[in-house]
Curated annotation (Swiss-Prot):
Cellular-component GO terms for this entry: cytoplasm
UniProt keyword list: Amino-acid biosynthesis, ATP-binding, Cytoplasm, Kinase, Nucleotide-binding, Threonine biosynthesis, Transferase
HAMAP family according to UniProt: Homoser_kinase
Span of the signal peptide: none
Organism in which the protein naturally occurs: Escherichia coli O6:H1 (strain CFT073 / ATCC 700928 / UPEC)
Entry's family note: Belongs to the GHMP kinase family. Homoserine kinase subfamily.
Localization per Swiss-Prot or TrEMBL: Cytoplasm
Upper classification of the organism: Bacteria, Pseudomonadati, Pseudomonadota, Gammaproteobacteria, Enterobacterales
Protein name: Homoserine kinase
């Protein structure tokens, strides 16, 4: 039996639309991510467990884990009879890389079960392909950090899909999921087809400056450059209370905040534990919409997807 855990991730990070993402893990030791188990069997089967299992498609072939198994078998050119179990701990349409968690855990578990026939680059390419079936287009800003860990910059040149960018140990990521769903496809459809020249220049300056600040170890500069002129101005209308929440967390002391992925999760970066706790408390009382919502104080998950049992 192989059991693989794949962590949540926060894509875009305001400054890097479709090209930046960070894997995150709660500081209290909770597992914020999906788990997939693969066991040898006579025929294929898929079982769904976990807090959000009831949100998965009722038709098994529509389940992305089934599609991962099917695509992996196609890649190897043979049928692989296994019993798969998806522990769905991540809310769907949350902006925390929920589909990426399932895809990464499923493909990595299959690869481990079969003795690692695929290298990491090929595996990551498959992960992007499968996640793209849900989000509507191939982009790696969730699957890459989820699989590889840390903060990842998408390269997609010279056979390099992504490379790690150094993060800041003092940064605490407060993630508030309000309990409502925003589909990635819907959030992409709301974006304009063309952008003004000054917005393109600002976006390039912010992203280049942020990467420079990460490598030159300037956390204050990096945080100040986490501005979004590409998606947030259009997507914030999908998120009730988002603008007020951003203003509130800034007043409490967050050094940066924005939409995690395509939302509705809000992320707030803090450089002090007491500030992070006060931000988390405020968001828990004011940003959550229902009982399914949650707030976690996280750090970068530098390990990425990992085998829990083998």
């Amino acid at each position: 039996m192989v059991k693989v855990y794949a962590p949540a991730s926060s894509a875009n990070m305001s400054v890097g639309f479709d090209v930046l993402g960070a894997a995150v893990t709660p500081v209290d030791g909770a597992l914020l991510g999906d788990v997939v188990t693969v066991e040898a069997a006579e025929t294929f089967s898929l079982n769904n467990l976990g807090r959000f299992a009831d949100k998965l498609p009722s038709e098994p072939r529509e389940n992305i884990v089934y599609q991962c198994w099917e695509r992996f078998c196609q890649e190897l050119g043979k049928q692989i009879p296994v019993a798969m179990t998806l522990e769905k701990n991540m809310p769907i349409g949350s902006g925390l890389g929920s589909s990426a968690c399932s895809v990464v855990a499923a493909l990595m578990a299959m690869n481990e079960h079969c003795g690692k026939p695929l290298n990491d680059t090929r595996l990551l390419a498959l992960m992007g392909e499968l996640e793209g079936r849900i989000s509507g287009s191939i982009h790696y800003d969730n699957v890459a950090p989820c699989f590889l860990g840390g903060m990842q910059l998408m390269i997609e040149e010279n056979d390099i899909i992504s490379q790690q960018v150094p993060g800041f140990d003092e940064w605490l990521w407060v993630l508030a999921y309000p309990g409502i769903k925003v589909s990635t496809a819907e959030a992409r459809a709301i974006l304009p087809a063309q952008y003004r020249r000054q917005d393109c220049i600002a976006h390039g300056r912010h992203l280049a400056g942020f990467i420079h600040a990460c490598y030159s170890r300037q956390p204050e500069l990096a945080a100040n450059l986490m501005k979004d002129v590409i998606a947030e101005p259009y997507r914030e209308r999908l998120l009730p209370g988002f603008r007020q929440a951003r203003q509130a967390v800034a007043e409490i002391g967050a050094v940066a905040s924005g939409i995690s992925g395509s939302g509705p999760t809000l992320f707030a970066l803090c450089d002090k534990p007491d500030t992070a706790q006060r931000v988390a408390d405020w968001l828990g009382k004011n940003y959550l919409q229902n009982q399914e919502g949650f707030v976690h104080i996280c750090r970068l998950d530098t390990a990425g997807a990992r085998v829990l049992e083998n």
